[in-house]
Amino acid sequence: MIKKGLLLPLMAFAVSTALYAEKSTQLELTSPGGVHKVKFYGKTSASGANGLYYTVDFKDKSILKESKAGLHVDNRVWEMALGKRTLQQPECWMDNMEIDSVSYSKHSGEWTPLYGERSLVKDNYNAGVVYMSKKDKSKYRLNVEVRAYDEGIAFRYFLPEHPDAIFHKVTGDLTEYSFADGTMAWSEQWAQGWFEHLDVNALTNPVER
């Protein structure tokens, strides 16, 4: 079962340490305590279109099967206005995006919330970045910034500034969440509400948590 368009929790980014990069087409991260594991990798379809995918494991058990990741961007009008009228226009913006390299870093720290049940929150994670680009002379790039916490997985898309000042018009979020059949979730429709233990297929309306 695939869920699309869900919002990931936003988390404040801090300075990372021990950064190193490698030439690879796959990023693999494990949280500091080995609780969560996430992979990002590229695949090419029979038609020749590229795709970005990811998986998530919890305590060596798959909780998110192979799921699609990425953005759809429509810059056609802006490209034409700047005289770039010969660029490829693939069906999906990600179709000709390729992984160039990945980088890794670690972070260990604490932060103080403005309010809440705890006065001090641990901020420990392993991080990585997937660096992608197009090879069609468009100079488009996309970075996927990933973090693995013992409490969960977080990732976001980052579009580096284009060298020719082409504006990025994001028109769709391609991120999918492929759960195994029978996956259950504790759901609450509003703060201080009651939790229900439901099959994820039953979550047809937005919920707060």
Role assignments for model-derived ranges:
Residues 19-21:
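Boundary at the C-terminal end of the N-terminal hydrophobic targeting segment
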Residues 1-8:
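Bacterial N-terminal signal peptides that target proteins for export
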Residues 8-16:
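Bacterial N-terminal signal peptides
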Residues 24-209:
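N-terminal accessory beta-strand-rich subdomains and adjacent acidic, glycine-rich linkers
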Residues 16-17, 31:
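A general, composition-driven signal for non-globular sequence regions
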